[in-house]
């Protein structure tokens, strides 16, 4: 009986303590002129609910508090904006104090010189260096031939096999980028890079708690290893004095570029290119295969476009820049895949001073999460929004609407958009002209916080 009374007292005491803690945290952030919303627990806030429920959490909060509300997610107090006009205002006003506000874990692991972490003149310089590597001329003359060569090799010997298309597209996105950046082929060095890189990616999506066995710790350790690998590569190239025709070679060739980067800046830029291209290229490619399987008429139209290109060529001829530019329906498939799968859920900004937005005062240092996911399913923008309909993108103006934020917006719009589209287009070209496929079935897809198949997405491939 005494034990039961002690247990009961402890239980009620814990309930009272938790209630008081929640109340204290709410009062702490109940400042005048802040948007409505809830803040959850101290330190952790509402991160658990956000990551677990994702879109449902956002919809519930919007139903209660409107399209502009406060929360505490990803380790910091955050304002969530789900209003298209406000989103655009936030994205185009970096000069007024709305700078990138990516999680500390991402900044720590991608490096202090990465393009997402720097502002002002430093951002302009680093962005200029990046754009010089992936300009239309570079894509046409240097990168597309490398991509074509890689895709031909990567898609060899898939006939009569069951493959995990998620695993294949993950490797494809990483190894293709590594070939373009540093000329590294499928060697032991590439494998070492890849295993550490996957740890790095998971680390950027975690709370910055540097304890053993946490994703953040593994990601940070992976960064150290990758930095050492890249530093060794730079030193070896500098010692050999041989100019390599890849991105790293271009950055190191002082006569070829006006952007003079330090070794640390080059390393962070390379890691950023690998990171930013990996998630979008791999996941969009996987989901395109999924959607094409589920929509035979779309696949028929896409295959028709690519067979027309192949009919003009010898079997061994690569695709060139003019071929890529002619792939209008392919581009439509990629854009529709990006919209419907929602590879990118939103964009983070941070206030550098107290700011008035939408009639509220947002304190200095708060994050603003421009949550763009719901825009992708707005029937006013996309009739029948949950259907996979690439033909809607044959109207070129749709891609340039202010509401289309899959590739970001403002001065931070994704600089690698065209390179990514070129990679996915080349993959689809060889995949649909060489193979047919059917799903094995039973594989689960998750759409939040990342689009992924936890147990893989298996398909049975046969020659076309």
Swiss-Prot record:
Membrane topology of the entry: Single-pass membrane protein
Transmembrane segments: 2-22
InterPro entries according to UniProt: Cyt_P450, Cyt_P450_CS, Cyt_P450_E_grp-I, Cyt_P450_sf
Localization (cell): Membrane
Catalytic activity: 6-deoxocastasterone + reduced [NADPH--hemoprotein reductase] + O2 = 6alpha-hydroxycastasterone + oxidized [NADPH--hemoprotein reductase] + H2O + H(+); 6alpha-hydroxycastasterone + reduced [NADPH--hemoprotein reductase] + O2 = castasterone + oxidized [NADPH--hemoprotein reductase] + 2 H2O + H(+); 6-deoxocastasterone + 2 reduced [NADPH--hemoprotein reductase] + 2 O2 = castasterone + 2 oxidized [NADPH--hemoprotein reductase] + 3 H2O + 2 H(+)
Amino-acid positions noted as binding heme in the UniProt annotation, renumbered to this chain: 414
Biological process per Gene Ontology, one example term: brassinosteroid biosynthetic process
GO CC aspect terms: membrane
Domain of life per record: Eukaryota
Function: Catalyzes the C6-oxidation step in brassinosteroids biosynthesis. Converts 6-deoxocastasterone (6-deoxoCS) to castasterone (CS). May also convert 6-deoxoteasterone (6-deoxoTE) to teasterone (TE), 3-dehydro-6-deoxoteasterone (6-deoxo3DT, 6-deoxo3DHT) to 3-dehydroteasterone (3DT, 3-DHT), and 6-deoxotyphasterol (6-deoxoTY) to typhasterol (TY), but not castasterone (CS) to brassinolide (BL).
UniProt protein name: Cytochrome P450 85A1
Organism of derivation: Solanum lycopersicum
Gene: CYP85A1
């Amino acid at each position: 009986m005494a034990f039961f009374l002690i247990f009961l007292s402890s239980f009620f005491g814990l309930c009272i303590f938790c209630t008081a803690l929640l109340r204290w945290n709410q009062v702490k952030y109940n400042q005048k002129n802040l948007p409505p919303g809830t803040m959850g627990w101290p330190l952790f806030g509402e991160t658990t609910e956000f990551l677990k429920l994702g879109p449902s959490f956002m919809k519930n909060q919007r139903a209660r508090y409107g399209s502009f509300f406060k929360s505490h997610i990803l380790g910091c107090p955050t304002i969530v904006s789900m209003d298209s006009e406000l989103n655009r205002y936030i994205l185009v006003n970096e000069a007024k104090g709305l700078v990138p506000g990516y999680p500390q874990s991402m900044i720590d692991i991608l490096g202090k010189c990465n393009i997402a972490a720097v502002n002002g003149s430093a951002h302009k310089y680093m962005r200029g260096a990046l754009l010089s590597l992936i300009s239309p001329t570079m894509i046409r003359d240097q990168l597309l031939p490398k991509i074509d060569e890689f895709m031909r090799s990567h898609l060899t010997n898939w006939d009569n096999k069951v493959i995990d298309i998620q695993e294949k597209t993950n490797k494809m996105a990483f190894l293709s980028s590594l070939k373009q950046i540093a000329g590294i082929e499928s060697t032991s060095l590439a494998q070492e890079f890849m295993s550490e890189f996957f740890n790095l990616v998971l680390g950027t999506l975690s709370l910055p708690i540097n304890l053993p066995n946490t994703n953040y710790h593994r990601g940070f350790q992976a960064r150290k290893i990758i930095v050492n690998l890249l530093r060794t590569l730079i030193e070896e190239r500098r010692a050999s004095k041989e100019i390599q025709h890849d991105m790293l070679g271009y950055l190191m060739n002082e006569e070829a570029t006006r952007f003079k980067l330090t070794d640390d800046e080059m390393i962070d830029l390379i890691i950023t290119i690998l990171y930013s291209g990996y998630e979008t290229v791999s996941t969009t490619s996987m989901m395109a295969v999924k959607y094409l399987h589920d929509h035979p008429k779309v696949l028929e139209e896409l295959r028709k476009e690519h067979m027309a290109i192949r009919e003009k060529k010898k079997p061994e001829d690569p695709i060139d820049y003019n071929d890529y530019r002619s792939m209008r329906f392919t581009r439509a498939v990629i854009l529709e895949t990006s919209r419907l799968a929602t590879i990118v859920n939103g964009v983070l900004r941070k206030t550098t001073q107290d700011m008035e937005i939408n009639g509220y005062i947002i304190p200095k240092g708060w994050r603003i999460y421009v949550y763009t996911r719901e825009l992708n399913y707005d029937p006013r923008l996309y009739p029948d929004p949950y259907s996979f309909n690439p033909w809607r993108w044959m109207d070129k103006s749709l891609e340039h609407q202010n509401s289309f934020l899959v590739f970001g917006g403002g001065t931070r719009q994704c600089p690698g958009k065209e390179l990514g589209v070129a990679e996915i287009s080349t993959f689809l070209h060889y995949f649909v002209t060489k193979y047919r496929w059917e799903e094995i079935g039973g594989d689960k897809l998750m759409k939040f916080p990342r689009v992924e198949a936890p147990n893989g997405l298996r398909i049975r491939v046969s020659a076309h």
